[in-house]
Amino acid sequence: MRYVAPAPYGVEAMTLAQLREMAPPGYLTAPQRPAFHLLILGSCGQATHTVDFREYPIGRGCGVWVRPGQVQRFSSDDEKLSADLVLFQPDFLIPGTEAAAIADDRFGPVNYDCSHSTRYHLDQARSTLREGYAEALQTARPGDAMQTEMLRHLLSVLILRLTAAPAPRTNGSHHGADGLHGRFRDLLERDFAVAHDVEHYARVLGYSSRTLSRATQTAVDQTPKQMIQERIALEAARLLAHSSLAVAPIAAGLGFRDPSNFSTFFTRQTGIAPTKFRRQQQQSATEP
């Protein structure tokens, strides 16, 4: 999914219906890995949205946040859904603000379900952003700093309203993690493709493997080894679904010298062979 925000902005607001009109047939149901943030905020109707191979419901009061680097796919039944979309670049928000910190959390929740008490304020925030964006397109001159700043603040309000809603833990996020577990998680994000052993992470963090294991099990009920294997398998699945790379270069890029060892690992982690997983993703993209 490609996105270039209209100059001079790093944000775009549209409806799902408008996106469907712009996209060629079959484009939206194919796996995409955007380098920008995508918020999908349901207005009425029901549909599902796939993010990193999990389906999330979208309806009135439900929102989905796709973060840069995640693989996402629109469902074939999204014509039943009316929704607002907000697309924005990772560096658009004001640094040092709460909204920017929320957006920068790559482990943040995917789905949000707003209660009646918070839905009104969320609806107001997204309506105001939509109107502000339309006004900016009509009236702003290239390089208009005031309009850009206004859109940054309107988007910040929307994010704060959205994240005030409870986020189910079932989406696999570990939002708000700190301490040793949080530092391990960040280091894992940096090194998972080159370091598969727990000892590497414990050494870099300055702790014993046992101490690191206690920290992760307390935080998320997983061992460091389980977290390492899950992260490698997720990246492999993303590349198999979205890229055209053959299995061998994917394996090499993830630190496997032997493609057969990678295939064994992926099958053990996911229950399906890499080539079969790729075929399934391609077939699901073309199903009506």
PLM feature spans:
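Generic protein-terminus/edge-of-domain signal
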Residues: M1-G59
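Ligand-binding loop in jelly-roll beta-barrel domains
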Residues: Q70-L93, A99-A100
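Short, Lys/Arg-enriched, Trp-marked, Pro/Gly-tolerant hinge/linker segments that flank
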Residues: Y120, P142-L151, L160-L205, T218, ...
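Terminal helix-turn-helix DNA-binding modules in bacterial transcription factors
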Residues: T218-P259, R279-P288
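A secondary-structure capping/hinge motif
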Residues: T216-T223, F265-R279
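Residues within helix-turn-helix
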Residues: E199, R210, A246-P249, P259-S260, ...
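Short hydrophobic/aromatic patch on the recognition helix
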Residues: G61, L212-S213, N261-F262, F266
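Amphipathic alpha-helical segments enriched in hydrophobic/aromatic residues interleaved with Lys/Arg
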Residues: D105-V157, R161, D186
